[in-house]
Protein backbone atom coordinates (compact mmCIF):
# COMPACT_ATOMS: atom_id res chain seq x y z
CA UNK A 1 0.00 0.00 0.00
CA UNK A 2 1.36 3.41 -0.96
CA UNK A 3 1.99 5.71 1.98
CA UNK A 4 1.06 9.30 1.34
CA UNK A 5 -1.73 11.45 0.01
CA UNK A 6 -2.83 10.51 -3.50
CA UNK A 7 -4.12 13.16 -5.93
CA UNK A 8 -5.45 12.27 -9.38
CA UNK A 9 -4.15 14.88 -11.84
CA UNK A 10 -5.94 13.49 -14.90
CA UNK A 11 -9.26 14.42 -16.47
CA UNK A 12 -11.91 11.74 -16.72
CA UNK A 13 -12.42 10.95 -20.41
CA UNK A 14 -15.93 11.15 -21.87
CA UNK A 15 -16.52 9.13 -25.05
CA UNK A 16 -18.14 11.23 -27.75
CA UNK A 17 -17.50 14.49 -25.90
CA UNK A 18 -13.75 15.02 -26.12
CA UNK A 19 -12.06 17.52 -28.46
CA UNK A 20 -9.77 14.80 -29.76
CA UNK A 21 -11.70 11.69 -30.85
CA UNK A 22 -12.71 9.07 -28.31
CA UNK A 23 -15.37 6.56 -29.30
CA UNK A 24 -16.39 3.20 -27.84
CA UNK A 25 -18.13 0.40 -29.71
CA UNK A 26 -19.53 -2.38 -27.56
CA UNK A 27 -20.02 -6.00 -28.65
CA UNK A 28 -21.04 -9.15 -26.90
CA UNK A 29 -17.95 -11.32 -26.73
CA UNK A 30 -19.36 -14.09 -28.92
CA UNK A 31 -20.14 -11.60 -31.71
CA UNK A 32 -16.42 -11.03 -32.20
CA UNK A 33 -15.08 -14.38 -31.06
CA UNK A 34 -17.58 -17.22 -31.54
CA UNK A 35 -15.44 -19.58 -29.48
CA UNK A 36 -16.39 -17.49 -26.43
CA UNK A 37 -19.69 -19.11 -25.58
CA UNK A 38 -22.25 -16.85 -23.90
CA UNK A 39 -25.79 -17.48 -22.72
CA UNK A 40 -28.29 -14.89 -23.93
CA UNK A 41 -28.85 -13.50 -20.44
CA UNK A 42 -25.14 -13.18 -19.57
CA UNK A 43 -23.43 -9.76 -19.77
CA UNK A 44 -20.04 -10.54 -21.32
CA UNK A 45 -18.70 -7.80 -23.57
CA UNK A 46 -15.64 -6.68 -25.52
CA UNK A 47 -15.16 -3.09 -26.66
CA UNK A 48 -13.39 -1.42 -29.55
CA UNK A 49 -11.79 1.93 -28.78
CA UNK A 50 -11.13 4.63 -31.37
CA UNK A 51 -9.05 7.24 -29.64
CA UNK A 52 -6.62 10.02 -30.50
CA UNK A 53 -3.22 9.67 -28.89
CA UNK A 54 -3.66 13.27 -27.66
CA UNK A 55 -7.01 12.78 -25.94
CA UNK A 56 -7.49 14.24 -22.46
CA UNK A 57 -4.59 14.40 -20.04
CA UNK A 58 -1.77 12.94 -22.10
CA UNK A 59 1.96 12.52 -22.42
CA UNK A 60 3.76 13.38 -25.64
CA UNK A 61 6.85 11.25 -26.16
CA UNK A 62 9.91 12.47 -28.12
CA UNK A 63 8.72 10.58 -31.21
CA UNK A 64 5.93 13.18 -31.49
CA UNK A 65 8.43 15.74 -32.84
CA UNK A 66 11.53 13.63 -33.56
CA UNK A 67 11.30 10.74 -36.00
CA UNK A 68 14.19 9.04 -34.18
CA UNK A 69 12.87 9.83 -30.71
CA UNK A 70 11.66 7.38 -28.09
CA UNK A 71 8.02 6.36 -28.42
CA UNK A 72 5.47 5.02 -25.93
CA UNK A 73 6.87 1.52 -26.22
CA UNK A 74 10.55 2.38 -25.85
CA UNK A 75 10.49 5.22 -23.32
CA UNK A 76 12.10 4.02 -20.05
CA UNK A 77 9.57 3.30 -17.31
CA UNK A 78 11.89 4.66 -14.64
CA UNK A 79 11.63 8.10 -16.26
CA UNK A 80 7.83 8.07 -15.85
CA UNK A 81 8.02 7.89 -12.06
CA UNK A 82 9.95 10.43 -10.05
CA UNK A 83 10.32 13.62 -8.09
CA UNK A 84 8.21 16.51 -9.33
CA UNK A 85 8.16 20.22 -8.50
CA UNK A 86 5.04 22.33 -8.95
CA UNK A 87 5.64 25.85 -10.27
CA UNK A 88 2.81 28.33 -9.70
CA UNK A 89 2.21 30.75 -12.57
CA UNK A 90 -1.51 31.21 -11.99
CA UNK A 91 -0.93 34.97 -11.95
CA UNK A 92 -0.03 34.90 -15.64
CA UNK A 93 -2.76 35.80 -18.12
CA UNK A 94 -4.15 32.92 -20.16
CA UNK A 95 -5.07 34.03 -23.65
CA UNK A 96 -4.83 33.50 -27.37
CA UNK A 97 -1.90 34.31 -29.65
CA UNK A 98 -2.40 38.03 -29.08
CA UNK A 99 -3.19 38.11 -25.35
CA UNK A 100 -1.23 35.21 -23.82
CA UNK A 101 1.25 36.41 -21.19
CA UNK A 102 4.85 35.19 -21.37
CA UNK A 103 6.86 33.43 -18.66
CA UNK A 104 10.44 34.53 -19.13
CA UNK A 105 13.81 33.01 -18.31
CA UNK A 106 14.47 35.40 -15.38
CA UNK A 107 11.13 34.37 -13.88
CA UNK A 108 12.09 30.70 -14.10
CA UNK A 109 15.52 31.31 -12.64
CA UNK A 110 13.83 32.23 -9.36
CA UNK A 111 13.35 28.45 -8.98
CA UNK A 112 16.80 27.50 -10.27
CA UNK A 113 17.91 25.74 -7.08
CA UNK A 114 14.88 23.42 -7.24
CA UNK A 115 15.24 22.58 -10.93
CA UNK A 116 17.72 19.72 -10.77
CA UNK A 117 18.76 17.49 -13.70
CA UNK A 118 16.09 14.88 -14.33
CA UNK A 119 13.45 16.62 -12.22
CA UNK A 120 9.86 16.59 -13.44
CA UNK A 121 8.29 20.05 -13.65
CA UNK A 122 4.57 20.72 -13.52
CA UNK A 123 3.34 24.25 -14.29
CA UNK A 124 0.08 25.43 -12.75
CA UNK A 125 -1.41 27.96 -15.19
CA UNK A 126 -4.93 27.74 -13.71
CA UNK A 127 -6.11 26.49 -17.10
CA UNK A 128 -7.79 23.21 -16.14
CA UNK A 129 -10.98 25.25 -15.73
CA UNK A 130 -11.01 25.79 -19.51
CA UNK A 131 -10.91 22.09 -20.40
CA UNK A 132 -13.77 21.18 -22.73
CA UNK A 133 -14.83 24.82 -23.20
CA UNK A 134 -14.36 27.33 -26.04
CA UNK A 135 -11.31 28.60 -24.13
CA UNK A 136 -9.64 25.19 -24.01
CA UNK A 137 -6.51 26.46 -25.80
CA UNK A 138 -6.12 29.72 -23.87
CA UNK A 139 -2.98 29.73 -21.75
CA UNK A 140 0.14 31.66 -20.76
CA UNK A 141 3.32 30.54 -22.48
CA UNK A 142 7.00 29.96 -21.85
CA UNK A 143 9.40 31.90 -24.02
CA UNK A 144 11.62 29.84 -26.29
CA UNK A 145 14.63 31.06 -24.31
CA UNK A 146 13.08 29.67 -21.12
CA UNK A 147 12.31 26.30 -22.73
CA UNK A 148 15.82 26.12 -24.17
CA UNK A 149 17.29 26.74 -20.70
CA UNK A 150 15.16 23.96 -19.18
CA UNK A 151 16.16 21.51 -21.91
CA UNK A 152 19.84 22.26 -22.48
CA UNK A 153 21.14 23.73 -19.24
CA UNK A 154 18.88 22.30 -16.54
CA UNK A 155 18.22 19.01 -18.38
CA UNK A 156 14.79 18.45 -16.83
CA UNK A 157 13.22 15.02 -17.06
CA UNK A 158 9.70 16.08 -18.03
CA UNK A 159 7.72 19.28 -18.54
CA UNK A 160 3.98 19.40 -17.91
CA UNK A 161 1.10 21.77 -17.29
CA UNK A 162 -2.65 22.00 -16.83
CA UNK A 163 -3.04 23.72 -20.22
CA UNK A 164 -3.29 22.45 -23.79
CA UNK A 165 0.31 23.53 -24.36
CA UNK A 166 3.10 25.68 -22.99
CA UNK A 167 4.69 27.55 -25.86
CA UNK A 168 3.76 30.66 -27.79
CA UNK A 169 0.73 30.15 -30.02
CA UNK A 170 0.96 30.96 -33.71
CA UNK A 171 4.66 30.10 -34.02
CA UNK A 172 5.15 27.48 -36.77
CA UNK A 173 6.45 23.98 -36.04
CA UNK A 174 6.39 24.21 -32.23
CA UNK A 175 10.10 24.94 -31.70
CA UNK A 176 9.74 24.47 -27.94
CA UNK A 177 8.46 20.94 -28.43
CA UNK A 178 11.26 20.30 -30.89
CA UNK A 179 14.09 21.27 -28.58
CA UNK A 180 12.61 19.26 -25.71
CA UNK A 181 12.02 16.18 -27.80
CA UNK A 182 15.36 16.39 -29.57
CA UNK A 183 16.71 15.98 -26.03
CA UNK A 184 14.35 13.08 -25.23
CA UNK A 185 12.25 15.15 -22.82
CA UNK A 186 8.53 14.27 -22.85
CA UNK A 187 5.64 16.66 -22.27
CA UNK A 188 2.43 16.38 -20.25
CA UNK A 189 -0.57 18.43 -21.39
CA UNK A 190 -4.03 19.01 -19.88
CA UNK A 191 -3.38 17.99 -16.29
CA UNK A 192 -5.98 18.91 -13.67
CA UNK A 193 -6.40 19.24 -9.89
CA UNK A 194 -3.07 20.99 -9.44
CA UNK A 195 -4.88 23.29 -7.02
CA UNK A 196 -5.66 20.22 -4.87
CA UNK A 197 -1.98 19.63 -4.15
CA UNK A 198 -0.91 20.70 -0.67
CA UNK A 199 2.80 20.53 -1.35
CA UNK A 200 5.03 21.82 -4.11
CA UNK A 201 7.17 18.69 -4.15
CA UNK A 202 5.74 15.21 -4.63
CA UNK A 203 6.24 11.92 -6.46
CA UNK A 204 4.63 11.79 -9.89
CA UNK A 205 3.45 8.60 -11.60
CA UNK A 206 2.79 8.87 -15.34
CA UNK A 207 0.84 5.74 -16.23
CA UNK A 208 0.95 5.39 -20.01
CA UNK A 209 0.43 2.38 -22.25
CA UNK A 210 3.55 0.75 -23.67
CA UNK A 211 2.68 0.73 -27.39
CA UNK A 212 5.32 0.51 -30.10
CA UNK A 213 5.21 3.39 -32.57
CA UNK A 214 2.81 5.53 -30.49
CA UNK A 215 3.73 9.24 -30.34
CA UNK A 216 1.56 10.15 -27.35
CA UNK A 217 -0.86 8.51 -24.96
CA UNK A 218 -3.66 9.47 -22.57
CA UNK A 219 -2.44 8.89 -19.03
CA UNK A 220 -3.57 8.38 -15.48
CA UNK A 221 -1.42 11.04 -13.84
CA UNK A 222 -1.01 10.48 -10.12
CA UNK A 223 0.71 12.61 -7.48
CA UNK A 224 1.70 11.14 -4.13
CA UNK A 225 2.50 13.64 -1.39
CA UNK A 226 4.42 12.71 1.74
CA UNK A 227 2.27 12.80 4.85
Task: Indicate where each model-derived feature is located.
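Active-/binding-site microenvironments in catalytic and ligand-binding cores
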Residues: 1-227
